[in-house]
UniProtKB/Swiss-Prot annotation:
It comes from the Eukaryota. The active site is at R218. Its cofactor is Ca(2+). It comes from Aspergillus terreus (strain NIH 2624 / FGSC A1156). Pectinolytic enzyme consist of four classes of enzymes: pectin lyase, polygalacturonase, pectin methylesterase and rhamnogalacturonase. Among pectinolytic enzymes, pectin lyase is the most important in depolymerization of pectin, since it cleaves internal glycosidic bonds of highly methylated pectins. Favors pectate, the anion, over pectin, the methyl ester. Transmembrane segments: none annotated. One of its GO terms (molecular function) is pectate lyase activity. The lineage of its organism: Eukaryota, Fungi, Dikarya, Ascomycota, Pezizomycotina. This is Probable pectate lyase B. It catalyses: Eliminative cleavage of (1->4)-alpha-D-galacturonan to give oligosaccharides with 4-deoxy-alpha-D-galact-4-enuronosyl groups at their non-reducing ends. Belongs to the polysaccharide lyase 1 family. GO terms for biological process: cell wall organization; polysaccharide catabolic process. InterPro entries: Pec_lyase (IPR002022), Pectin_lyas_fold (IPR012334), Pectin_lyase_fold/virulence (IPR011050), PEL (IPR045032). It is an enzyme of class 4 (lyase). It is found in: Secreted.
């Protein structure tokens, strides 16, 4: 089985330089891609803004106006954008970062919408008043790919919110090739033990080919969801790894932990445990203490994702995850 197209494109993009004209053409082609991997291929698929026009934005005002526009749109972020804002992303959007672009202090709120792609974005230091770097709430069919999400460990734990939170029954989400780093709170799935009525039976999420480095906890923390984690690498976690809570069903495959505390796959801080099937995972001396679950590769509704193999994860994933397109 061949590697997914998005994985191969990352390798090609880093292998050789190209002219500005070719780079712009590559950017437009990649910004027009639909999600090919994981749960966001379900429910009709995730195409983002491909049905609409393409615009390039260079400042916060332009980015906000384009992202909140109610028509389908592909938005290409160029250069460095900074400020203090919470952008409410509308349905049928692709927001794609050019190589070298960055967004500082601005959170993206994807609430009660559908068909959104966030790709090749570098987002950092979002103040808690502006929410998560990316927050997905009551939304369907969202693809987060090749993003670089970071915070600031020198700040107080509650000064910044999560890097990527998925809550309130959101469905058909894929998080792929993303670099989570230098932050207190990584990724929270399901915000409360008391939200079973909304969350149970929803929160179908794939985490594929991601790199977690120097993150304190929530890598991810999962309540109620059905979550497939494959080809992920956790390095230098500060407190804990994958927290399986509140009847969550989790499948962890072809992944590795290095330089991490004892609790790699565990349960804590909820009324009752979740469950995990763990297949070809190098715990790096850490432990898995979660009861075995029922989510298996054969029960997944989408095409198989090629497993890199735990022995190759540490030398592969850091070179491909993040803003690498």
């Amino acid at each position: 089985m061949r590697l997914p197209t998005l994985f191969m494109l990352a390798a090609i993009a880093t292998a050789s330089p190209m002219s500005d004209l070719n780079r712009r053409e590559m950017t437009r082609r990649q910004a027009a891609e639909s999600c090919p991997i994981g749960y966001c291929t379900q429910n009709g698929g995730t195409t983002g803004g491909t049905a609409g026009d393409t615009v390039t934005v260079t400042d916060l005002a332009g980015l906000t106006e384009a992202a909140e526009n109610e028509t389908p749109l592909t938005i290409i972020v160029s250069g460095a954008i900074s400020g203090s804002a919470k952008i409410r992303v509308a349905s049928d959007k692709t927001i794609y970062g050019e190589t070298g672009s960055s967004i500082t202090g601005v959170g993206f709120y994807i609430r009660r919408v559908s068909n959104v792609i966030m790709r090749n974005l570098k987002i950092g230091q979002v103040d808690a008043d502006n929410g998560d770097a990316i927050g997905i709430d009551e939304s369907t069919n969202v693809w987060v790919d090749h993003c670089d999400l970071s915070g600031d460990l020198s700040a107080g734990k509650d000064d910044l919110d999560g890097l990527l939170d998925i809550t309130h029954g959101a469905e058909w989400i894929t998080v792929s090739n993303t670099y989570f780093h230098d932050h207190w709170k990584g990724s929270l799935i399901g915000h409360s033990d008391s939200n079973e009525g909304e969350d149970l039976g929803h929160l179908h999420i794939t985490y594929a080919n991601n790199y977690w480095y120097n993150v304190n906890s929530r890598t991810p923390s999962i309540r109620f969801g059905t979550v497939h984690i494959i080809n992920n690498y956790w390095d230098n976690l500060l407190l804990t790894g994958v927290n399986c809570r509140m009847d969550a069903q989790v499948l962890v495959q072809s992944s590795a932990f290095s330089n991490c505390p004892d609790e790699a796959i565990f349960f804590a801080d909820s009324d009752y445990t979740g469950y995990a099937v763990v297949d070809d995972v190098d715990l790096g001396g850490s432990t898995n203490s979660v009861p075995e679950g029922t989510l298996t590769p054969s029960s997944l509704p989408y095409d198989a994702i090629e497993a890199i193999g735990s022995a190759q994860i540490a030398t592969t994933i850091p070179g491909t995850a993040g803003q690498k397109l």
